């Protein structure tokens, strides 16, 4: 609590009617602290006989009382200063926990959350990489599937072409079989016609006479027919064997191609089924990864929102603590300023006390018994007093006595 001190100014001018007129240089001197001491206790050194009267005794008593009050006030100020120091010390001790709050738990929590966020981010990145790899694998499988599908279509087109060739060969075989049957029927017809002609000729020859003539040997028709038949049969057999051999060869080749194509088709079908299963599994896994990513993103968003709110609360707490710290610092600065003001007041009071002490010590000097031997302020001897002091101290202007004034008293008092 600040103390405002107003140093009193003592206007202690006594009436000059109680003593002889003094020269103009013997007026009252102003002391430090704005207190005017009467001329009879001043440092003018113009003392006449009987100058230390009752008013001056009252002034000295008043000064002693003021000195005692100053000393008491100094002690009171020292006690107040000690109380203020104790109060400041207690306040500082009470505010110490607020000055340095412990945020280690918050820091640990923040570090753990940061580690979790980093782990979540790394897991999210790993899942993204896995998803990208799965997409690339799916693209590869899709490309392979398209390739195998094109190969399958080519094989199916080849199989269809071979089937058409097989149908053509079957038709050709049926045509050849029909030709063989027609040739067999024609051969039978020729045989029957030949037998009929032979029988007819035999009948005709049997009715005739046997006339032997010398002529060229006749042609054996049976032999010729047999040779012709054997030639045709050999030709037909050769053609048949060639056709059968060609048909067998083509059939075997077609069978081999069909078997290989069927095997390839089965392998392709198995591979296609396996690829479909893989694609389905990858799609399911991709959907699961998408769901996991969405859940992780939601969890991350919730964690960020929750920890941002906690961080804002911690920040507000830090702001409040900083504001309290600023208030405490301002209070400490204000109390320090008040303490400095009190120290200044104490120093001024000590200076005034020293001044009053020097004045009191100067007043303790022995007063001269012979007023005519009194020296002035310049330590020069003063001539003997005349019977009429007013005539000896006549200034250039006529001397007019001072108007009577009331007894001096303190002008101001301490204001707290």
Curated annotation (Swiss-Prot):
Misc remark: There are two types of hair/microfibrillar keratin, I (acidic) and II (neutral to basic).
Coiled-coil ranges from the UniProt annotation: none
Annotated keywords: Coiled coil, Intermediate filament, Keratin
Region of interest called Coil 2, as start-end residue ranges on this chain: 220-363
Domain IF rod, first and last residues per copy: 56-367
Chain positions covered by the region annotation Head: 1-56
GO terms for MF: structural constituent of cytoskeleton
Coil 1A as annotated region, ranges: 57-91
Cell cycle keyword on record: no
Similarity comment: family membership: Belongs to the intermediate filament family.
PROSITE patterns the UniProt entry points to: IF_ROD_1 (PS00226), IF_ROD_2 (PS51842)
Annotated segments matching region Coil 1B: 103-203
InterPro entries: IF_conserved, IF_rod_dom, Keratin_I
Matching PANTHER family: INTERMEDIATE FILAMENT, KERATIN, TYPE I CUTICULAR HA1
Region (Linker 12): 204-219
Region Linker 1, residue ranges: 92-102
GO cellular component terms, semicolon-separated: cytoskeleton; cytosol; extracellular exosome; extracellular space; intermediate filament
Protein name: Keratin, type I cuticular Ha1
Start and end residues of each stretch annotated as Tail: 364-416
Site feature (Stutter) residues: 305
GO BP annotations, alphabetical order: epidermis development; epithelial cell differentiation; intermediate filament organization
Tissues in which the UniProt entry reports expression: Present in scalp but not in hairless skin. Abundantly expressed in the differentiating cortex of growing (anagen) hair. Expression is restricted to the keratinocytes of the hair cortex and is absent from inner root sheath and medulla.
Keyword flag Coiled coil: yes
Gene3D superfamilies to which the protein is assigned, alphabetical: 1.20.5.170, Single helix bin, Vasodilator-stimulated phosphoprotein
């Amino acid at each position: 609590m600040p103390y405002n001190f107003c140093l009193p100014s003592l206007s202690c001018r006594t009436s000059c009617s109680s003593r002889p007129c003094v020269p103009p240089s013997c007026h009252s001197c102003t002391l430090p602290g704005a207190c005017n001491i009467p001329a009879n206790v001043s440092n003018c050194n113009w003392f006449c006989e009987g100058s230390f009267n009752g008013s001056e005794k009252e002034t000295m008593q008043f000064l002693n009382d003021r000195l005692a009050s100053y000393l008491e006030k100094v002690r009171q100020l020292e006690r107040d200063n000690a109380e203020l120091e104790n109060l400041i010390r207690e306040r500082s001790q009470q505010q110490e926990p607020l000055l340095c709050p412990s945020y280690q738990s918050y820091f640990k929590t923040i570090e753990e959350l940061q580690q979790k966020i980093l782990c979540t981010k790394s897991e999210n990145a790993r899942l993204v990489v896995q998803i990208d790899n799965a997409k690339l694998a799916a693209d590869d499988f899709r490309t392979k599937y398209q390739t195998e599908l094109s190969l399958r279509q080519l094989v199916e087109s080849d199989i269809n072409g071979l089937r058409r060739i097989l149908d053509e060969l079957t038709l050709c075989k049926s045509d050849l079989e029909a030709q063989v049957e027609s040739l067999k029927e024609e051969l039978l017809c020729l045989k029957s016609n030949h037998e009929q002609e032979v029988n007819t000729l035999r009948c005709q020859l049997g009715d005739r006479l046997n006339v032997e003539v010398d002529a060229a040997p006749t042609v054996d028709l049976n032999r010729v027919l047999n040779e012709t038949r054997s030639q045709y049969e050999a030709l037909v057999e050769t053609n048949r064997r060639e056709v059968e051999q060609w048909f067998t060869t083509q059939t075997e080749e077609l069978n081999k191609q069909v078997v290989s194509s069927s095997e390839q088709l089965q392998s392709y079908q198995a591979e296609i089924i396996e690829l479909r299963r893989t694609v389905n599994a990858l799609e399911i896994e991709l959907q699961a990864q998408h769901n996991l990513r969405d859940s992780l993103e939601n969890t991350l968003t919730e964690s960020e929102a929750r920890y941002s709110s906690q961080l804002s609360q911690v920040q507000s707490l830090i702001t409040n603590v900083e504001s309290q710290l600023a208030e405490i610092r301002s209070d400490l600065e204000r109390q320090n300023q008040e303490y400095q003001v009190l120290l200044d007041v104490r120093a001024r009071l000590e200076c005034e006390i020293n001044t009053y002490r020097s004045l009191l010590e100067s007043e303790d000097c022995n007063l001269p018994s012979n007023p005519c031997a009194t020296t002035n302020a310049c330590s020069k001897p003063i001539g003997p007093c005349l019977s009429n002091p007013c005539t000896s101290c006549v200034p250039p202007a006529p001397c007019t006595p001072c108007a009577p004034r009331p007894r001096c008293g303190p002008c101001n008092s301490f204001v707290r």
